[in-house]
C-alpha cells in the first residue's frame, strides 16, 4: 500500500505519561488499515521481554536493538516504523530523517528530559524535523497534579539507568525539589 508521504510523529514527556501507550495505539491504527509496520525498542530495556509493554501491561511485539542501523534493512519492507525509548538511540535524528524522506511514517516515543531536567539533545534535534509533536504529562506521584518531570529515586549519576516505578517517579515542578 503506497503511503501519502513520509512523516515524523514525536511523542514526548516524562516517565509514566503514556508515551508507549500512544505509540502502540497509533501503530495499531496503521495495522488495522493494513500498513506494514515495524516496532523497535531499545535492546537494554529488557524489563518486558521482546516487545513494547506499557506500565499497565498493554503490549506489542517489537525488534530489540541497540542501534537503529541494525534495523535499516528490515525498514525497507515496511511503511510505518514505531520507535520506543527513542532517547537512547544516538542516531535517531539521521535515521528518522532518512526514513521519512523515503516515504515512511515514523512514530517515536521518547523522554524529552533526563532525571536532572536536562534535554535529551537528540530528541530536541528531532522536534524541528517532525510534522507532529505531542507533549504528554503524567500525574505527580506525590501531590497528584500534572507532572512534567521524571525524578530518580536513587543516587546514581549516570543518565542511562533503565527502570520503572522502582527507580523513578513522575513529579510536578514543586515536588521535583522535595
From Swiss-Prot:
Catalytic residues (UniProt): 85
Pfam families documented for this protein: TK
Keyword Metal-binding attributed: yes
Gene3D superfamilies in alphabetical order: 3.30.60.20, P-loop containing nucleotide triphosphate hydrolases
GO biological process, one term: thymidine metabolic process
Top-level lineage group: Viruses
A GO MF term: metal ion binding
InterPro entries according to UniProt: P-loop_NTPase (IPR027417), Thymidine_kinase (IPR001267), Thymidine_kinase_CS (IPR020633)
Transferase listed as a keyword: yes
Keywords tagged on the record: ATP-binding, DNA synthesis, Kinase, Metal-binding, Nucleotide-binding, Transferase, Zinc
Documented EC number(s): 2.7.1.21
Catalytic activity: thymidine + ATP = dTMP + ADP + H(+)
Binding site for substrate: 115, 159-163
Entry binding sites for ATP: 13-20
Positions that bind Zn(2+): 140, 143, 172, 175
Family: Belongs to the thymidine kinase family.
Descriptive protein name: Thymidine kinase
Amino acid at each position: 500500500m503506497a503511503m501519502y508521504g513520509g512523516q515524523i510523529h514525536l511523542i514526548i514527556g516524562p516517565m509514566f505519561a503514556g508515551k508507549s501507550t500512544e505509540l502502540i495505539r497509533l501503530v495499531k491504527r496503521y495495522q488495522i488499515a493494513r500498513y506494514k509496520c515495524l516496532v523497535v525498542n531499545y535492546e537494554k530495556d529488557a524489563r518486558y521481554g521482546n516487545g513494547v509493554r506499557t506500565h499497565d501491561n498493554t503490549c506489542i511485539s517489537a525488534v530489540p536493538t541497540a542501534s537503529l542501523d541494525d534495523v535499516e534493512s528490515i525498514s525497507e519492507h515496511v511503511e510505518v516504523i514505531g520507535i520506543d525509548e527513542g532517547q537512547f538511540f544516538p542516531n535517531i535524528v539521521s535515521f528518522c530523517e532518512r526514513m521519512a524522506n523515503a516515504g515512511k511514517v515514523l512514530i517515536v516515543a521518547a523522554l524529552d528530559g533526563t532525571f536532572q531536567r536536562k534535554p535529551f539533545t537528540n530528541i530536541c534535534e528531532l522536534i524541528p524535523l517532525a510534522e507532529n509533536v505531542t507533549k504528554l504529562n503524567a500525574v505527580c506521584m506525590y501531590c497528584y497534579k500534572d507532572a512534567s518531570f521524571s525524578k530518580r529515586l536513587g543516587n546514581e549519576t549516570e543518565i542511562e539507568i533503565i527502570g520503572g516505578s522502582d527507580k523513578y517517579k513522575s513529579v510536578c515542578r514543586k515536588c521535583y525539589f522535595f
